[in-house]
Structure formats: C-alpha cells, structure tokens
C-alpha cells in the first residue's frame, strides 16, 4: 500500500507517524511546501518573546529523522494537481515536476492566513505569522522597530502582542469585535484579560476595525474607523486562517460551509481520499452541527483516526468541544464548550454562574485567585466553562471537557471526588464551588 500525504503540519506528519506505528511495510510519502517539518507553530510567539531561545528549539524532528523510520518527507515542493480518477498527485520543486501514484491520499493542506480587506496591506512591514519562516522575518523586523500593531485578538494575536511588548516595543492590540477572544470567552471574562494586558502596557483597541494602513512604501500608521491614527513600524495580521481547499476541490471532495466534509473515519466523499487538520470540518459535540476546529490537538487526534482507518481498523474521530488554554505573562486562561452568548445565538437558554476562588488553601502561601464561569443549559447539563488564573487552569479545563463529553449535569459534577492537599488545592475544588453555585439557580 502506498499512502501519499499532502501537508507536513501537525495533521500530515502525525498521520505519517501513526501509519508507521501500525503498518511497518506500507510506503509513506509526505509532500510539504515548508523546509521544516514537525515543529510547533503554537510556540512561535514564545520564541519571539525570548522565553524559548531559538526557533531551532521548536523543531522536534527533521526530514532525515523520518527517513530513518522509512517515511519519505519531500520538502519545499508545491502540489499542483490531484487526479482522483487515476489516483495520481503532481508536484513541482524548484528544478522539476513529478507525478506519483497513490493507493490512499490524505489531504492535510491546513489553512492560509486571512487577509482583511483594507488599503495598505501590501506595504512593507506588514506580516502574517503562520510558519517558522514568518516568525524569523518578524524577529528580524523587531530589531529596528519601536512600535507595533497586532490586529486580531484571538489566542495568537494576544500571545504575539505580549511577546512584542516583552521585547520593548510599544504595542497596540486591535480587535474589530467589542471584546477579545470572542469565540472562547464571554465579555466579562475577556475584560479580566484586557485589564491585565493594559496593566502590562499594551494599548487595547476594541470595536474599531483598521480601515487602512498608511505609509510611503513601508507602513507608518494605521487608521481606525474614520480618523484615529496610531503609529506603527510594523503590523501583524492575526486575523485567523481559512481552510486551504484548492486540492480538495480538484479531487472532487464535498466542501461544506468552511472546509472539507468527512465522515467520522476522516473519509471524504471521494474514494481513498481522506482529510485531516485545519482543512476539515468537525462535528460539534453539543449541537451535532458542523463546525471548524483549527487546533493542533484536533489535527493530532484526527491523524490517529485516519491512520487506523487506512489500515483497516475503521476508527472514529469524536465530535469536538474546542477546548483551549493559553498563557500571557503570569496569567493563564482557558475555555471549553459554549460561551453564554453563543448558546443564546443557538436558542439555548444558558444558566450561568461566575465565581472567584483560590488555587490552593487560603492560608497556604502564594494562593492565587481563580475566576471560573460555568454555563449550563436549562436542564442543568454543563455546556461550557471559562477559567482565568495564574496557575492550574489547564487541568481544570480538561476536567470540564470530560464532564461535558459525558453529558454531566451541574448536580452530578458537584458530587465528584477531587484530590486535596493545602499546597496544591482547596478542600473543595473551585470547579465544585462553581457548579454548586449554579445548581442553586435550579431550585
């Protein structure tokens, strides 16, 4: 069996690795436009901040490493054609063009940065950050810059803004929505983050899109709304990504609202063509509708399902909740499931409780405040959770991910057993305090 994988990101390279673990004999070819594989794009902001020393440190394996596992990773090539009828893929490098056959094809083409429609995006000094090469370019530009604007206040935008500020730049973080991280946090929770960012010296501009970038060949200012101007030696576009669908369309795959449609085995509508990662739509666990889940964790889980399916195991990829966690400076923040505003938009009447607790016993040194928001539906079933604290956020988001996945109500979770010791927790965990409080709203 010959498996060709298009894309060397988290979905593609993980598919190759998982295939090799199951099938020691199949031929595996990975085609990627990057010169590096098996690196963590999520770590790029932390290299820019200086927390991680070098971009080399976030490259886990090279093409040569995969060669030792009998996986042929062909770098710096562009796939130009997919013929699903004759089961061939054509790619070109700097020096040649080649067509190869496949038995199974995996599309892991990822996403491409969304460029907002505004005048001046073609100016020098305007950057997107998707790859290590993008990160290196920004790192070089930072050396001569005094001011920067990051537009788009999702996870990556916030992390990059903080990284630039840590390196001494005057930073403005702009978001056209009236809040930051709008997909994951409600406004009252995101306001906690805004206060922290402003305390750290970042200028946060909300509800005002950048209408144009101004400069003579190189960006000098950004115009917000009709007239507000802010100086900028560099501008980072962190406005999200859109699924890369050209090859999927060429292959004849069914395309949904955002990305490629697959079944739970990661099979597309075309026989022997599969898809994983940012180019794929996923099922929403709560409503069962299609959604987009452009997370590295999603791509890796999909890669396990597709590898098993290709090898005859017919493995399933489960619906998603888009659980996330991040850290800027001292502050960790995470979320899973629905915000109360998203629930309302989807005709769910949310029952909500927000509390403040501590990360450890109140008498123990360095106990940190923890803000928790729990969202339930009208029957008490937990459908969302948001947490902000200086520590211990990720494991509680994971606990709530399991609770939502299992369909637990706030009443059921309130009886859950948690471990306790004064240096690491409260005798009643903050999650239990939160669900106990929201439970009272049903009495």
Task: List each model region and its residues.
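A Rossmann-like FAD-binding core segment of flavoenzymes
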Residues: 25-27, 67-69, 73-93, 100, ...
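Beta1-alpha1 glycine-rich phosphate/pyrophosphate-binding loop at the start
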Residues: 1-72, 163-185
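Glycine-rich Rossmann-fold phosphate-binding loop(s) that bind the pyrophosphate
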Residues: 7-10, 130-131, 151-154
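A conserved FAD-binding loop/helix module that cradles the flavin
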Residues: 262, 276-339, 424-442
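FAD-site-proximal beta/loop scaffold in flavoenzymes
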Residues: 122-145, 217-223, 228-308, 399, ...
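Flexible, glycine-rich terminal cap/loop adjacent to redox cofactors
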Residues: 6-10, 20-25, 33-34, 239, ...
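Short hydrophobic core segments
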Residues: 6, 100-110, 230-240, 303, ...
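Rossmann-like dinucleotide-binding cores of NAD(P)H-dependent redox enzymes
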Residues: 58-59, 147, 156-212, 293-298, ...
């Amino acid at each position: 069996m010959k498996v060709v994988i298009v894309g060397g990101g988290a979905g593609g390279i993980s598919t190759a690795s998982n295939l090799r673990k199951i099938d020691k004999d199949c031929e595996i070819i990975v085609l990627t436009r990057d010169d590096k594989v098996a690196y963590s794009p999520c770590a790029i902001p932390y290299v820019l901040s200086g927390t991680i020393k070098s971009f080399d440190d976030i490259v886990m394996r090279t093409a040569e490493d995969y060669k030792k596992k009998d996986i042929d990773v062909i770098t710096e090539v562009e796939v130009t054609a997919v013929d699903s009828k004759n089961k061939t893929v054509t790619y070109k490098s700097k020096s040649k063009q080649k067509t190869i056959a496949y038995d199974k094809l995996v599309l892991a083409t990822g996403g491409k940065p969304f460029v907002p429609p505004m005048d001046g995006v073609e100016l020098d000094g305007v950057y997107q950050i998707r790859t290590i090469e993008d990160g290196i370019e920004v790192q070089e530009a930072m050396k001569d810059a005094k001011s920067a604007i990051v537009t788009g206040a999702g996870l990556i935008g916030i992390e990059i803004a903080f990284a630039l500020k840590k390196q001494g730049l005057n930073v403005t973080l702009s978001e056209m929505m009236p809040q930051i991280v709008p997909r994951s946090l409600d406004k009252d929770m995101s306001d906690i983050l805004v206060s922290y960012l402003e305390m750290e010296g970042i200028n946060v501009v909300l509800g005002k899109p950048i209408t144009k970038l101004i400069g003579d060949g190189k960006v000098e200012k950004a115009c917000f709304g009709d007239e507000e101007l802010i100086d900028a030696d560099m501008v980072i576009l962190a406005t999200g990504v859109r699924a890369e669908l050209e090859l999927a369309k060429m292959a004849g795959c069914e395309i949904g609202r955002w990305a490629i449609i697959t079944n739970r085995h990661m099979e597309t509508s075309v026989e022997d063509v599969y898809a994983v990662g940012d180019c794929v739509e996923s099922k929403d666990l709560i409503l069962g509708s299609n959604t987009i889940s452009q997370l590295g964790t999603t791509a890796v889980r999909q890669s396990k399902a597709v590898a098993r399916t290709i090898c005859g195991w017919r493995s399933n990829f489960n619906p998603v909740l888009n659980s996330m966690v991040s850290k800027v400076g001292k502050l960790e923040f995470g979320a899973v499931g629905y915000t109360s505003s998203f629930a309302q938009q989807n005709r769910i009447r949310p029952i909500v409780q927000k509390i403040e607790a501590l990360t450890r016993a109140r008498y123990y040194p360095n106990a940190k405040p923890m803000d928790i928001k729990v969202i339930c539906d009208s029957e008490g079933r937990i459908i969302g959770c948001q947490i902000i604290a200086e520590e211990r956020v990720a494991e509680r988001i994971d606990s709530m991910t399991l609770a939502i996945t299992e369909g637990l109500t706030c009443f059921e979770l309130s009886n859950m057993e948690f471990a306790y010791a004064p240096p690491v927790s409260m005798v009643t965990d903050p999650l239990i305090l939160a669900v106990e409080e929201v439970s009272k709203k049903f009495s």
